Every structure is written in structure tokens, then in C-alpha cells.
């Protein structure tokens, strides 16, 4: 049987850790002047993916 392919977009966006799947919030690259300080602060921490989405991400990264 051939090797399963990893979805490279998912591999770059998500990282599997012991506590779950870590990801960085979107919308924090540029044009931040129109965003409020509160909004920028809430986007700051890396987060753990919700359990309802874990199976979808792991399917895209079979070797994670």
C-alpha cells in the first residue's frame, strides 16, 4: 500500500502536542491599526484546537 500523503497546509498550521493540537489565531499579520487593543490581545495566545475539530485535522496529518 502506498504512503499516505500529509496535507502540507495543515502541517504548517497545526502542531500536535501532548495537550492537544496547537494552532495560531488568524488575522494577526498586518493592517492591525483598525483592530482594538482588546481584539489584538485576544488573538495573541496560541490555542488548543477544540475536540470537535481534532479528528478532521488528524486525518490531514496521518503521521502526526
From Swiss-Prot:
Keyword Ribosomal protein assigned: yes
UniProt keywords, alphabetically: Ribonucleoprotein, Ribosomal protein
Pfam families per UniProt: Ribosomal_L35p (PF01632)
PROSITE patterns the UniProt entry points to: RIBOSOMAL_L35
Gene3D superfamilies assigned: 4.10.410.60
One GO BP: translation
A GO CC term attached to the entry: cytosolic large ribosomal subunit
A molecular-function term among this protein's GO annotations: structural constituent of ribosome
Family designation: Belongs to the bacterial ribosomal protein bL35 family.
NCBIfam families: rpmI_bact (TIGR00001)
Protein name: Large ribosomal subunit protein bL35
Source species of the chain: Vibrio atlanticus (strain LGP32) (Vibrio splendidus (strain Mel32))
Name of the coding gene: rpmI
